[in-house]
Design a protein with these regions (language model features):
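Conserved helicase NTPase motor core
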Residues: 1, 23-24, 31-32, 57, ...
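Conserved RecA-like helicase ATPase core segment
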Residues: 10-11, 204-309, 313
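Conserved, well-folded catalytic cores of nucleic-acid-processing
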Residues: 12, 38, 42-45, 71, ...
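P-loop NTPase Walker
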Residues: 1-80, 84-85, 91, 185, ...
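ATP-hydrolysis module of ASCE/P-loop NTPase motor domains
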Residues: 52-55, 73-168, 191, 254-261, ...
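Generic recognition of well-ordered alpha-helical segments
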Residues: 7, 37, 41, 63, ...
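Short loop/turn elements that form and flank the Walker-type P-loop nucleotide-binding site
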Residues: 18-19, 52, 188-190, 215-217, ...
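Short, basic/glycine-rich phosphate-binding loops at helix/coil junctions
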Residues: 70-72, 151-152, 287-294
Length: 314
């Protein structure tokens, strides 16, 4: 999938699009750097000997979000000199607010700072009510719903007083800014192409941002695999990729990447059989030109040491 996206970017550049008008979104800094390197290698082999200037708008959703927020801060009532809290700093601030409310003592048995931050983060990224998030994901915290609501309100106020944003705010504030039609159009018009890697891992906020930037889908390319959506516990929403084509009129074109380069056909046969059970999915039949007569084995081991010993012995 990633190689497909890199070739797409290289093709766009080869067709004359300036790299500064390409927005490429990934889920890690390392993935963004790898994407840049792949694009450069592909263009270096081009018959015209093309080279690409630095893809200045390639990065994670959060990094790009921070950059846009600093640039458009005054348009949305934000101080551009805001500081960014990492997860540890955010948890410490949450704990400070817990302490002010008298909820940090062992006797209170109130959720830990890490759990509180996880609940808050889930409500923001999943765009779900607190009650729903607690009931479905953190049911052991149901008795504390009112206290959590007060805590989160105070946490937000503390961030505003200190002119700082946490990682979730980097998405939330951009999504809110892009809900202003003229601002979304202005930002969207800066990019002829927006490309997203691992789209099955996006959450509701990220999908909102993309659809606001390119509401008609022009120049929008996403790559992903609905069968690899395994980050629901981090608020990833598989419906983002399943519903992507129908957001547009006419519907987005779906290109199926059915060839697998890593596995042998017996492994893919097993994978195809499992994937076929899904009630809703994009139809694809994975295949490989790597033949093998050996079928996958189901092996039961006692622990990780036994597992490692078995694998090493093979």
């Amino acid at each position: 999938k990633t190689n497909t996206l890199a070739n797409r970017v290289a093709h766009i550049v080869a067709e004359g699009c300036h790299p500064s008008r390409i927005l490429m979104l990934t889920f890690s800094r390392r993935a963004a750097e790898e994407m840049r390197r792949r694009v450069e290698r592909i263009l270096a082999k081009h018959p015209k000997g093309l080279s690409v200037a630095r893809l200045e708008w390639a990065g994670t959703f959060h990094a790009i979000g921070a950059r846009l927020l600093r640039e458009y801060a005054y348009r949305i009532g934000l101080d551009p000199e805001f500081s960014i809290l990492d997860r540890e700093d955010a948890a410490d601030l949450m704990n400070l607010v817990r302490h002010e409310f008298g909820l940090s003592t062992k006797e209170s048995r109130f959720p830990t700072k890490a759990t509180c931050l996880a609940i808050y983060s889930r409500t923001v990224n999943a765009q779900r009510p607190l009650n729903e998030v607690v009931k479905t994901v953190f049911p052991w915290c149901l008795n504390w719903e009112l206290e959590l609501k007060r805590l989160f309100q105070a946490y937000v106020e503390a961030k505003q007083r200190n002119n700082c944003l946490d990682y979730d705010d980097l998405l939330l504030y951009v999504a809110q800014a892009m809900s202003i039609p003229e601002l979304a159009e202005e930002v969207g018009s800066r990019f002829d192409h927006i490309l997203v890697d691992e789209y099955q891992d996006t959450n509701r906020l990220q999908a909102r941002i993309l659809l606001a930037l390119k509401p008609h889908g022009e120049g929008l390319t996403v790559v992903g695999d609905d069968a690899q959506s395994i980050y629901a516990f981090r608020a990833a929403e598989v419906r983002n990729i399943l519903d992507f084509p129908k957001h547009f009129n006419p519907p987005a074109e779906v290109v199926t990447l059915s060839r697998n380069y890593r596995s042998t056909q017996p492994i893919l046969n097993a994978a195809n059989a499992v994937i076929a059970i899904a009630k809703e999915r994009f139809t694809k039949d994975l295949w490989s030109d790597r033949p093998s007569g050996q079928k996958p084995l189901i092996v039961t081991v006692r622990d990780e040491i036994d597992e490692a010993t078995y694998v090493a012995g093979r």
